[in-house]
């Protein structure tokens, strides 16, 4: 006859399964998630969207400091709203998508900042250049899923985005804001 053990053993086993389930990576709903780049071109605001990206998020609301995130963006997928410009930004002077097909962010820390806000730090790598970054992010639950939103300002020239004649910041501003809204659940 097989026994399940004492009630305390059974409870401990069930709790450990529940804890593992909470700590499992969330499944990103890519159809409802967005990553965009906002910048100014000739002082006119532009918002372009990355059409292909992956986000792996291990998030535990009870222990946010144990959370991790990794994001990979297909640099050739930037859609600025015009096919010719989309091809242009994939070229060597901009993202050089042939040599650097992915931009990545890997978190090194996620800290609670109160009121549904987190401070996220990590390494951002674009076009062979990496730097440590930190930015605020909000997290809320909506329809049983986690919604992560934030904005990360960067300087495009620090990553060699816009080489040669495109270094001129009077045409395309140096400041770019990477905005994201990622929806994920179990």
Each model region followed by its residue ranges:
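Bacterial N-terminal signal peptides
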Residues: 7-18
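N-terminal secretory signal peptides that target proteins for export/translocation
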Residues: 1-6
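Low-complexity, acidic/polar, glycine-enriched regions of mature
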Residues: 21-186
């Amino acid at each position: 006859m097989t026994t399940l053990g004492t009630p305390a053993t059974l409870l401990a086993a069930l709790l450990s399964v529940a804890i593992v389930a909470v700590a499992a990576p969330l499944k990103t709903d890519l159809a409802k998630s967005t990553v965009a780049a906002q910048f100014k071109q000739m002082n006119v605001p532009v918002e372009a969207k990355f059409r292909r990206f992956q986000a792996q998020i291990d998030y535990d609301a009870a222990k946010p400091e144990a959370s991790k995130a990794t994001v990979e963006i297909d640099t050739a997928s930037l859609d600025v709203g015009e096919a010719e410009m989309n091809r242009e930004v994939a070229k060597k002077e901009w993202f050089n998508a042939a040599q650097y097909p992915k931009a990545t962010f890997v978190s090194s820390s996620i800290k609670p900042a109160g009121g549904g806000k987190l401070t996220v730090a990590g390494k951002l790598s674009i076009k062979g250049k990496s730097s440590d970054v930190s930015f605020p992010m909000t997290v809320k639950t909506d329809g049983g899923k986690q919604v992560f939103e934030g904005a990360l300002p960067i300087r495009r020239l620090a990553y060699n985005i816009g080489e040669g004649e495109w270094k001129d910041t009077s045409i395309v501003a140096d400041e770019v804001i990477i905005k994201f809204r990622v929806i994920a659940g179990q």
